[in-house]
Amino acid sequence: MTEISPTPAARDNVTSSTFPDVELLRIDHVGVAVPDLDAAIQFYAETFGLRCVHQETNEEQGVREAMLGVGDGTGTKIQLLAPARPDSAIAKFLDRSGPGLQQLAYTVADVEAAAAALRARGLRLLYDTPKRGTGGSRINFVHPKDAGGVLVELVEPATAV
């Protein structure tokens, strides 16, 4: 079993009240890496009845992505991620790990404040400043080595939550 082990700064004997709150609002989505986006959308639709509520290509990250929802599509989503180019993070993930769960994402009101709160706890984030995510959102990621092996994404929606 993987032990959740933050950096040494996060292990100091301090209480959580010493740090600013991260203020997670909800589970936003679970990301699944797939080699073929269209085939994966069809599989999730035919097998589980999920419907595609958003689809785009993020050139900056080199990924084709689709958000799949249940019912009216307003709850937690499944995000399918397929490489748009061979040097993308998703292509490297697929080469290393094969298809499957790639990330867990939380909605936050302010991605920079959440990142600062996590850094204050000694956790590393992948980006110094937020990047553009799905639908114009702003995102950052907690390094998986600081989150029990899970790539945690922080998502600030493009519109007010």
Language-model features, listed with the residues they occupy:
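Short, conserved turn/kink motifs that form compact alpha/beta structural patches or helix kinks used as
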Residues: 81-83
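Short loop/beta submotifs within extracellular cysteine-rich repeat domains
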Residues: 51, 74-77, 88-89, 149-150
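Extended macromolecule-engaging scaffold surfaces
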Residues: 2, 50-53
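Vicinal oxygen chelate
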Residues: 2-22, 27-35, 66-72, 76-78, 90-117, ...
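Amphipathic alpha-helical segments
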Residues: 36-51, 119-121
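An N-terminus-focused feature that recognizes amino-terminal "leader" regions
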Residues: 47, 62-65
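A cross-kingdom feature marking solvent-exposed beta-strand/loop segments within repeated
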Residues: 17-22, 26-28, 52-53, 60-62, ...
